[in-house]
Amino acid sequence: YMQLWDTNYLNFLKTHCNSITATNEMKAYSLLDQSKSRASSDGMPRMNFSAADKMVAWAQENGLGVRGHVLVWDAYMTPWFFHEQYDAGKPLVSREVMLQRLESYITQVITHFEEKFPGVVYCWDVVNEAVGEGSEFDPTDPRHIRTTRSGVSNVFYDTIGSDYVEYAFLYARNTVDALGADIRLFYNDYNTFYAEKRDAIVALTRSINSFAVDAD
């Protein structure tokens, strides 16, 4: 967050870059507002865009594009997002409720930045690192959707199931199309040069596209 106030760093970006990616400001744990979510009349999540807006506004003022990073990442979601009444001490919500929350969250985030800063956020990493390695996935699943990360359960998998990735892309594509925006949608991961992981990502991409979604 402090890089937003580092004049030397910002001057470097203006001189040498045409696109920036937020380290933290656009991740769910920076955007989701627990108190507002608990008080929402429709039960859907609410956001606080203040930190992210500062970064995107600076990019807009200086003619830089922004890569949105990231909408869905099991490693950086606030735990209470998955629980009844947005309270981590209460039971996990049902698949139906979690899908509603996921759709609302993705729709709100993409819409906010496109309407407030038209054309600045030119793409989104919709889902990050969903393909597991080693024993972190069901071996019968050719997509190798992550069930755990370093021994910790993937709560998206626990609440929605292995198709949470496809639904995330579906909701993102529907939002972009409704806005009439030129925003590209990406799946992001690491170690993609390993054959096993590469093949799983290819299988996942095909599954996403079979959901009538064009993942770039």
List each language-model region with its residue ranges:
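Short N-terminal signal/transit or membrane-insertion segments
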Residues: 1-2, 55
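Short, acidic/polar
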Residues: 2-15, 102-112, 197-208
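Substrate-binding cleft and catalytic face of glycoside hydrolase catalytic domains
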Residues: 15-36, 41-192
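Substrate-binding cleft/loops of secretory-pathway carbohydrate-active enzymes
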Residues: 186, 191-216
